[in-house]
Amino acid sequence: MPSKGPLQSVQVFGRKKTATAVAHCKRGNGLIKVNGRPLEMIEPRTLQYKLLEPVLLLGKERFAGVDIRVRVKGGGHVAQIYAIRQSISKALVAYYQKYVDEASKKEIKDILIQYDRTLLVADPRRCESKKFGGPGARARYQKSYR
């Protein structure tokens, strides 16, 4: 198999709560797969548009020259969806920065951040740990005076 020059690829991760999605972005023809399945096959169906937001915002032509493969682990269904969309967005920005030009990368970044900051910046909120003296992080056990 003849090689077509050096392999142009970037590896980026997206996170939400405990879900982590790792995206490999390389030169290709517009393929986006998550755990080996196309974006349209990902459940839950109600959050399908959340996954497609980066593609719809930036247009298919920006994704036409790249293949993105995402592996996602941990968390629940919703957290995984948010991790996937973040990793796809970050992968495209990183690819454009490394292999295309700085101006188009800045344009992409500005569009994404103006729409929704969590597409590029991780949400730092985490679950607060349980403390003694109560059933949860803040709730206390009921107390009686007699």
Swiss-Prot record:
<dbReference type="GO" id="GO:0016020">
    <property type="term" value="C:membrane"/>
</dbReference>
<dbReference type="GO" id="GO:0002181">
    <property type="term" value="P:cytoplasmic translation"/>
</dbReference>
<dbReference type="GO" id="GO:0022626">
    <property type="term" value="C:cytosolic ribosome"/>
</dbReference>
<keyword id="KW-0007">Acetylation</keyword>
<dbReference type="GO" id="GO:0003723">
    <property type="term" value="F:RNA binding"/>
</dbReference>
<protein>
    <recommendedName>
        <fullName>Small ribosomal subunit protein uS9</fullName>
    </recommendedName>
</protein>
<dbReference type="GO" id="GO:0015935">
    <property type="term" value="C:small ribosomal subunit"/>
</dbReference>
<dbReference type="InterPro" id="IPR020574">
    <property type="entry name" value="Ribosomal_uS9_CS"/>
</dbReference>
<feature type="modified residue" description="Phosphoserine">
    <location>
        <position position="3"/>
    </location>
</feature>
<comment type="subunit">
    <text>Component of the small ribosomal subunit. Part of the small subunit (SSU) processome, composed of more than 70 proteins and the RNA chaperone small nucleolar RNA (snoRNA) U3.</text>
</comment>
<dbReference type="GO" id="GO:0005730">
    <property type="term" value="C:nucleolus"/>
</dbReference>
<comment type="similarity">
    <text>Belongs to the universal ribosomal protein uS9 family.</text>
</comment>
<keyword id="KW-0963">Cytoplasm</keyword>
<dbReference type="GO" id="GO:0006364">
    <property type="term" value="P:rRNA processing"/>
</dbReference>
<dbReference type="GO" id="GO:0032040">
    <property type="term" value="C:small-subunit processome"/>
</dbReference>
<dbReference type="GO" id="GO:1990830">
    <property type="term" value="P:cellular response to leukemia inhibitory factor"/>
</dbReference>
<dbReference type="GO" id="GO:0070062">
    <property type="term" value="C:extracellular exosome"/>
</dbReference>
<dbReference type="GO" id="GO:0005737">
    <property type="term" value="C:cytoplasm"/>
</dbReference>
<keyword id="KW-0687">Ribonucleoprotein</keyword>
<dbReference type="GO" id="GO:0005829">
    <property type="term" value="C:cytosol"/>
</dbReference>
<dbReference type="InterPro" id="IPR000754">
    <property type="entry name" value="Ribosomal_uS9"/>
</dbReference>
<keyword id="KW-0539">Nucleus</keyword>
<dbReference type="GO" id="GO:0005654">
    <property type="term" value="C:nucleoplasm"/>
</dbReference>
<dbReference type="GO" id="GO:0006412">
    <property type="term" value="P:translation"/>
</dbReference>
<feature type="modified residue" description="N6-acetyllysine">
    <location>
        <position position="60"/>
    </location>
</feature>
<comment type="function">
    <text>Component of the small ribosomal subunit. The ribosome is a large ribonucleoprotein complex responsible for the synthesis of proteins in the cell. Part of the small subunit (SSU) processome, first precursor of the small eukaryotic ribosomal subunit. During the assembly of the SSU processome in the nucleolus, many ribosome biogenesis factors, an RNA chaperone and ribosomal proteins associate with the nascent pre-rRNA and work in concert to generate RNA folding, modifications, rearrangements and cleavage as well as targeted degradation of pre-ribosomal RNA by the RNA exosome.</text>
</comment>
<dbReference type="GO" id="GO:0042274">
    <property type="term" value="P:ribosomal small subunit biogenesis"/>
</dbReference>
<keyword id="KW-0689">Ribosomal protein</keyword>
<keyword id="KW-0597">Phosphoprotein</keyword>
<dbReference type="GO" id="GO:0005925">
    <property type="term" value="C:focal adhesion"/>
</dbReference>
<dbReference type="GO" id="GO:0003735">
    <property type="term" value="F:structural constituent of ribosome"/>
</dbReference>
<dbReference type="GO" id="GO:0000462">
    <property type="term" value="P:maturation of SSU-rRNA from tricistronic rRNA transcript (SSU-rRNA, 5.8S rRNA, LSU-rRNA)"/>
</dbReference>
<dbReference type="GO" id="GO:0022627">
    <property type="term" value="C:cytosolic small ribosomal subunit"/>
</dbReference>
<dbReference type="InterPro" id="IPR020568">
    <property type="entry name" value="Ribosomal_Su5_D2-typ_SF"/>
</dbReference>
<dbReference type="GO" id="GO:0045202">
    <property type="term" value="C:synapse"/>
</dbReference>
<dbReference type="InterPro" id="IPR014721">
    <property type="entry name" value="Ribsml_uS5_D2-typ_fold_subgr"/>
</dbReference>
<dbReference type="Pfam" id="PF00380">
    <property type="entry name" value="Ribosomal_S9"/>
</dbReference>
